[in-house]
Amino acid sequence: WIMGHMVNGIDQIDEFLRLGSNSPEFDINFDKDAKPVYTYHGVPCDCFRSCLRWEYIGDYLTALREVTTPGNPKFRENLSLFVFDLKTNSLYDSQAGKAGENLADDIFKYYWNEGNNGGRAYMIISIPDIEHYDLMTSFKHYFISNGHEELLDFVGFDFSANDNIPDVEKVFEKVRVPGVPDRVWQSDGITNCIMRGLNRVKEAVKVRDAGGIINKVYVWTVDKVPSIKAALDAGVDGVMTNHPDVVVGVLREDGYKDKFRYASYNDNPWETFKAE
């Protein structure tokens, strides 16, 4: 998966898709009542990017629904996965559960159109604080209690703060909901302004390949060819980047084109493929 980084403007969705992204990532900000309000990153952000693009969440999720609903004039077949980068650090730990419920309500209303011919894409809910695990639990229970447990088949989760992998595993085990399979992506990374090694990525890949709780691994934010190749060599499933076209170019090179391919909608984002 080629994850387009910081796609916070509606017009940027098509821009990043044209560049080769099949998985836009966007930032979700919450108000003091734990209600998601708008897409926005703010300063500082990645080098050489505008940090100030934003949209109201209802408008943004509606736009995503349009480009992922077959039959809609705006439908784009190659868009298969979203990454919700939640900005919950402004919330108290005690508000995490309410934030999850409110987010689920907005996704159900604006993206899944209240269960009536909504969008078809998968999504990763990426949480920046491991102590905000109640967000995940309440998100799941929202759909179960409203009779739409089947929609959880399209949802996976990630903790994005580069926590120790064993700590992440313990939290996912703690919040398991009976009857709802674990669907876990593990991210690792840092802003493109700073270099970061791949030791933790390799640890996450090892857990994935050993049949652990991690299904997929992605790295962020990598823009340069050597960094992209190093991440692919480490066995990641996704690369988050400001330059999807650069990743597309790497995937076409000898040594990569036979080992990796561009993910389509028919590829299950919860299915584990081991590094070889």
UniProtKB/Swiss-Prot annotation:
E.C. no: 4.6.1.-
Chief localization: secreted
Annotated CDD domains: GDPD_like_SMaseD_PLD
Keywords: Cytolysis, Dermonecrotic toxin, Disulfide bond, Hemolysis, Lipid degradation, Lipid metabolism, Lyase, Magnesium, Metal-binding, Secreted, Toxin
Gene3D superfamilies with a match to the protein in the record: Phosphatidylinositol (PI) phosphodiesterase (3.20.20.190)
Domain of life: Eukaryota
Statement: the UniProt record of this protein carries the keyword Magnesium: yes
Reactions performed catalytically: an N-(acyl)-sphingosylphosphocholine = an N-(acyl)-sphingosyl-1,3-cyclic phosphate + choline; an N-(acyl)-sphingosylphosphoethanolamine = an N-(acyl)-sphingosyl-1,3-cyclic phosphate + ethanolamine; a 1-acyl-sn-glycero-3-phosphocholine = a 1-acyl-sn-glycero-2,3-cyclic phosphate + choline; a 1-acyl-sn-glycero-3-phosphoethanolamine = a 1-acyl-sn-glycero-2,3-cyclic phosphate + ethanolamine
Tissue: Expressed by the venom gland.
Keyword Disulfide bond attributed: yes
Protein name, UniProt field: Dermonecrotic toxin LvSicTox-alphaII1
